[in-house]
């Protein structure tokens, strides 16, 4: 590596945790100060119950690394550690130091060593004119925001198990982020209201189980184009104000304790109605199970849908996929995962998935193909019933060796097709 220019070596050091970057200083005289030119500081010390000497060593290392920066700009500051109550002032000092250096990316993964939810986020985090990316976690409490809360440049925000009081998440925090475009929230409890006019990409994962069943989630985010939503079925469907929504990934799952009272009262139909105008829809395997249980009366039309990503066990292939295909007259791209799960017993003859005769599907993609005879029959059925098909992409399982992949490719190329334009790609 000695033949590489200094600027390239600094870029390589940027990708390393700070402790490893500093360790390169002993390699040679040339390397002695290279690490000080990196504008990325990444401190990872998740060990709990540390002896005092090790704790002091870590704290001194962070202090000295910040001191090395002098008056230079810090692009990225990451801190992953468990803390004690008496360490709050130390943490405040580090964060203030990073902010004073004009940090643009701040990633804090902090947890109180004894009492989760006890530690409050330092108020200095909420007033910065330079922050563009901010990550906060995990199991932290934010009782209030400072009166001068302002993050005018913030574009990307990740909140991992952050507890806010009342509606301060939207009314104060998000309101102070006028440039925010990408919001990710992972939480054990429902944030009741998420409101922002600027967000374009929203990822929301909730794992509240039975105790969150009564919450009503409201998304007032009219500029969101791309939504990822992971949750359990609820008594009350979420209320969406998503005028610009084009892409949705649904990851619904049954409550882990299998409380039938909650599940029987869940409202999934209204959730599906809220997203029926999207152009791209991704349904996970567990989502298909949930929809199959709660939407037996039918589905709305998906007139704008052009791309569907679908994964399921046996029931979903037999019932839900045909219904989705029937209700999506403008579908052009179909991506199928776990097709090998749709099998038939020895005493049952093969029955292909019903394909609407007027379908407009142009691209078919089969994921994790292993070459089973049943899946090959399904693929053959698709090719004979998709007249507009132009491209079929088959992703073979990574575990297959090259001779097996060649055999699978030959088998696929021999299949008869209804479309004269079809090109088959084995990936």
UniProtKB/Swiss-Prot annotation:
The superkingdom of the source organism is: Eukaryota
Q: Which SMART domains match?
A: FBD, FBOX
SUPFAM superfamilies in the cross-refs: F-box domain (SSF81383), RNI-like (SSF52047)
Origin organism is: Arabidopsis thaliana
Q: What is this protein called?
A: Putative F-box protein At3g44060
All copies of the F-box domain together span: 1-46
